[in-house]
Amino acid sequence: MPIIGGAVAGGAIALAIASGGSSSKSVTTTVVRPAQQAALPASFSSGKGLTVNQIYRSASPGVVDIIVTAQSSNPASGFFGGSGTQKTQGEGAGVVYDSRGDILTDEHVVAGATSVKVNFQDGRSYSAKVLGTDPSTDVGVIRVSAPASELHPIAFADSSAAQVGDPVVAIGSPFSLPETTTSGIVSQTGRSITAPNNYTIPNAIQTDAAINPGNSGGPLLDASAHVLGLNDQIETNNSTASGQGSSSGVGFAIPSNTVRRIADSIIGGQTVKHAYVGVLLAGNSAGGAEIASVQVGTPGALAGLQANDLITAIDGRAITSTDQFIADIDNYTPGQTVTMTVSRAGQTQNIKVKLGTRPASTPSGG
């Protein structure tokens, strides 16, 4: 369940991580299921003179296919002896970020990798290493040793400017079919999805462009062929035994502003840290973010936050929902102090909270 220093309770639907291979990961989120939008025809124009084909031709040289080999536990070893691990392969996509060979993808694509191979559009392949990952945002960075002629960085868009109805194009490797291109629209913005470590990724972009296993880490492109986000998850009610599902017209991308912020920290050799309050949040409540419980010893507990408190503002900015609270806290860094306006038993009070550093995974018991 989505968590910001805790978790959001109730009302979850299944999401499948959209990477290929034998992964059995699945996550949940509290997004409301909207009516599916019909995908735009391949001849649509963005209004800026770019068709799907033009977007593809502009961006595809900077999209790569990623093949990952990892070690996983071998359930048969206990019965038949031998090694307790086995090699597994997974597949995803990535975006060339700079001329140094840095490629951005999803953390879950490269998690646990023992080897990484990158396939470029011209068919050439090169080995890569994992430079760093952030499970809290599902962002990963790999670096490939390839000649400059292979590296075609794609410009990034400002994801905060995305609007419902904007045309988008997804490129990736669904079902081991590299350079597959699909089109659609931005179905909604500001969604919350669940990261590999069970925290919440705020401001995700929802799209009806077809996203399937193998699309993870590939770009969601705007009408200017700029990266609006990295394709990450799909809603599915028909997951296979491996935990994978197919497109249902409801997909989610990590917003480009989040991707760039995390990637720049990783490439710069910094440790990625996230602000932490330590509260379990109820589902979206009218007029604010309601606290279901407070983790003992956390910044929220030390500041005096209590269960049933309704947070209505942070530093004077109105908070109208749980999702907005999560997104707002994500803009801060550990060590900063914020003033939370809280409604408690009919009384309004301001409580100062010194934000901590988010633990590696959500506390046990939520």
Predicted feature residues:
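Edge beta-strands of extracellular beta-sandwich domains
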Residues: 351-354
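Serine-dependent protease modules
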Residues: 2-287, 296, 303, 317, ...
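Conserved catalytic motifs of ABC-family nucleotide-binding domains
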Residues: 308
